[in-house]
Amino acid sequence: MNESYEMIYILRPSLSEEQVNQEVNKYRDFLNEYNVKDLQVKIWGKRRLAYPIKRFIDGIYVQMNYQGEGNQVAPLERAMRLSEEVIRYMTLKVETAVSETPASVPEVLVPEPVEEPTPVAAEA
């Protein structure tokens, strides 16, 4: 059964555009060897990290969404762990959206606005 996955990884900020494309193509080809479906790659570009990672304060973010059996996750993460260009990665299994409507929608009661009395100016 195919599951949906989302992987975000961060590359070293010192990589050139050509090197970034080589890294992206390397991992894209890696996933294609595992016959994943609906592979989408988005390069977010260089962004500031929330905290320093391996002494880097910036990183090049890349997002990959795909559908696969699940046997590709561990080898892909191992390849990224061994790479010097990848400073952080994370893979998430994305839950599919449920298209069913609820059986009954409870009625929501909205309280009526309460009018507050206007203050009377104090006489001196």
UniProtKB/Swiss-Prot annotation:
It comes from the Bacteria. Pfam families: Ribosomal_S6. GO terms for cellular component: cytoplasm; ribonucleoprotein complex; ribosome. The keyword RNA-binding applies. The keyword RNA-binding applies. SUPFAM superfamilies: Ribosomal protein S6. GO terms for molecular function: small ribosomal subunit rRNA binding; structural constituent of ribosome. Keywords: Ribonucleoprotein, Ribosomal protein, RNA-binding, rRNA-binding. GO terms for biological process: translation. CDD domains: bS6_chloro_cyano. Belongs to the bacterial ribosomal protein bS6 family. Binds together with bS18 to 16S ribosomal RNA. This is Small ribosomal subunit protein bS6. It comes from Rippkaea orientalis (strain PCC 8801 / RF-1).
